[in-house]
Amino acid sequence: MAIFIDIGNTIKDFIQNNISELKQPGSIVFDSPAEIDPPGTPMLSVFLYQIVENSFLKNTGPEFVKNDQYLKPPLTIDLYYIFTPYARDKENELIIMEKILQLFHDNSVLKGDMLKGKLKDNGNDEIRIFSNSLTFEEINKLWERFPSKAFKLSAAYTLSPVRIPSGKPPVKVTRIMEKEINVYMKEIEY
């Protein structure tokens, strides 16, 4: 089970199949912007900067796999990414950024054949992509974590919900298959 790797491969294939400037091998990296030196060819940094448990889906009930067994619910998380384009000139960076924004606007759900690896097998039938509108202060704080790098235009997106199955084995239970109710009536005297 490698959910994060499968998510990364899904993002990478999705972008490479839709943005011509990023089709070359090695043009999409999952490194921190602090680790990237300006390349000669266009490149996109897809940096996972935060992982948060999804509080809305935290209380999901168990999933019955057989009449007498259930699985503990999966851990449901939200993944926060910043997408930062790199190119020789600012014009190409802006073109790549515009195409990223357009791609995620037009395709806000990853599903079906778009999902790579074992994402579907692990309960991730669809993963939504939505803009994470960071304020200027939040973006500034994020870029302060890369002290040797100058601020670069970035877009922040959240992928949600991402399900990570429980590592516990199925729990055996005795389910009520039939219920018998006896109703007795007491005679009332008038």
Say what each PLM segment does.
Residues M1-E21, Y70-N124, V162-Y190:
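Charged, amphipathic alpha-helical segments and their flanking helix caps
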Residues M1-G61, G117-G123:
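Small/polar-rich, solvent-exposed N-terminal microdomains that initiate assembly or binding
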Residues T41-S45, T76-I82, K152-A156:
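Broad gene-expression machinery/nucleic-acid interaction feature
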Residues F30-S32, V65-K66, I139-L142:
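Short structured motifs
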Residues L48-Q50, T158-P161:
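Flexible glycine-/small-residue-rich
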Residues P38-P39, Y70-L75, P147-F151:
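Short glycine/proline-enriched loop/turn "hinge" motifs that connect secondary-structure elements
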Residues F47-Y86:
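Active-site-adjacent structural patch at catalytic or cofactor/ligand-binding sites
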Residues I95, D106-S160:
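Acidic-leaning, charged glycine-interspersed low-complexity segments
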